[in-house]
Amino acid sequence: MGIDQKISPFHLAIPVWNLQDCVKFYTGVLGCKTGRSSTHWADMNLFGHQLVLHCKPKTSEKTHANAVDGKQVPVPHFGVLLQWKQFEDFANQLRSKNIEFIIEPYIRFKGSVGEQVTMFFLDPSGNALEFKSFKDPNQIFAKE
């Protein structure tokens, strides 16, 4: 199934230690719309998916990273698959808002099956986000 086909929205709840800062980030930087909320959680519309920010006390736990293509990919991470042009526009929008990338936008598997562009950055609570796009959306799960 390619990303241009109708899929069901996902629901993901993530921990945040400052709800106000994260709501501001997700709405002001990522362009999310808010849904229901309370003093300790808030629903976000993340590209049509339900992302819920839940307050949790800040911990000193460090994010783990795995080496991929010589880069340190944070684990866990989440994000959205975008159309190629949409990804380019979104990356430029993030740059204009001075987002600090963990991994700058770059192309993986150039000219090969599964060619994709990807980028990583953190929200104010340290949650890692990855946004990516496949040159051919029908190759999302292709092996060769």
What residue spans do the PLM features occupy?
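N-terminal beta-strand motif that seeds the catalytic metal site of vicinal oxygen chelate
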Residues: 1-21, 77-78, 82, 133-144
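Vicinal oxygen chelate
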Residues: 2-5, 8-17, 45, 65-144
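Short secondary-structure boundary/capping segments
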Residues: 4, 34, 42-43, 67-70, ...
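Core segments of cupin and vicinal oxygen chelate
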Residues: 14-58
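Alpha-helical elements of the RecA-like P-loop NTPase motor core of helicases
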Residues: 23-24, 88, 129
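A short local loop/turn or secondary-structure capping micro-motif enriched for an aromatic residue
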Residues: 52-53, 59-63, 137-140
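Active-site/binding-pocket entry motifs
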Residues: 58-59, 100
